[in-house]
Amino acid sequence: MFIKLSSTNSTSIFWLPIFFYNEPYWAQCAISSAELPFYMLSAYVVFVSCRIMLKIQLFHDNLMYIGVPMFGSWFLLIAGKLITILYRVRILNVESVKIHENWVFWTDEPEKMLNVQSLDGLVPLLVAGFLEIHFGFSVIFVGLAIVTERVIASMLIDNYEQSTSLLIPISFIIIYQFLAISISLGILFNILGLYVLNASWILCILIGTIMYYYIRKINTKWLQEMQNPNRKRVFTVSQQFQVRENLGAIAIGKRLVFVVLATIVVMGFGIVALVLEITVLFFMHFGENTLFCYPLYIFLVVMNGHPAWKQEFRKYFPKIKIFKKVRPGLVSVEIVEDQKKKLSLETDTYFRQLKSAWT
């Protein structure tokens, strides 16, 4: 939605990735009440997943310092959504503004914008919009930062795993947060247009894709060389670990890419349908919540990416027994005795062969 602030001296326009649907008040309250349990479950999944990733560190510290805050930034995203819900159910309200009739995603027509004379009562809504924009660009830039960190790790394979310096992760965090905050403010205040919005994430994806294939190619080559018994190069234990670490990160990243792309496709079709007014607004709630509830499927992919994470992740969720426990069937004593005799015979044969080999 757009907010157009008109004063005697100037006019300012703000863009927020927030939707308000023209629905009855009871429907808005009911939908908000239905969304909250899913957000609570998502928060629990995020907390558990971040704790497991820090407890069972499968990757280098630098990668964890860069990646884990990205997953934790979901709490900023949901904070923006909760502020929007407060406006939706009219806990936060502006009497002189019909805020609940603005659902246009992007427009240049002033009559489709929210026209106001002041920002009194709307500052929390601007904060919510900034948090959602900032989250999107943080994910984009931190993804590029993770790939770049793995490229540096591959180039410095001789001693990177032994380094404990925090210079690399701190530098990446400062750079990508500076870019995310700067672009988010530029888009919020409508300084950067739609072309810059699209060009920034498209460029990051292209650069990240090139780096991804570089990392996969060089580390696959090193793995094949390590497994070659006639190799001439000597790989240290730390170097072998780093190669497998890079390939493991690539495997998890590949799964995440497919899931994220599917989410973007669903949300993209929903936004297009909303702009063209070819769908019922009620169904847009489902498309919108594919973003806010993404931990329910993104983190499942991450946690199932490694057996150690998967095993630990299951401990935090109670087992639900749907079916009655099946009683074990009766086994004939004769069959058990035959199996024991067969196992004993094979064991005796093995030791006789071993004894004859030493004599």
Swiss-Prot record:
Listed transmembrane segments: 29-49, 66-86, 127-147, 172-192, 195-215, 256-276, 282-302
Where found in the cell? Membrane
**Predominant place of localization:** membrane
Q: Which domain of life is it from?
A: Eukaryota
Alphabetized Pfam families for the sequence = Sre (PF03125)
> What InterPro entries does the record point to?
7TM_GPCR_serpentine_rcpt_Sre (IPR004151)
Q: Which GO terms describe its biological process?
A: sensory perception of chemical stimulus
- Write out the GO cellular component annotations: membrane
Q: Which UniProt keywords apply?
A: Membrane, Transmembrane, Transmembrane helix
Membrane topology type: Multi-pass membrane protein
Family to which this protein belongs:
Belongs to the nematode receptor-like protein sre family.
Q: What is this protein called?
A: Serpentine receptor class epsilon-26
Q: Look up and give the organism this protein is from.
A: Caenorhabditis elegans
- Gene it is expressed from: sre-26
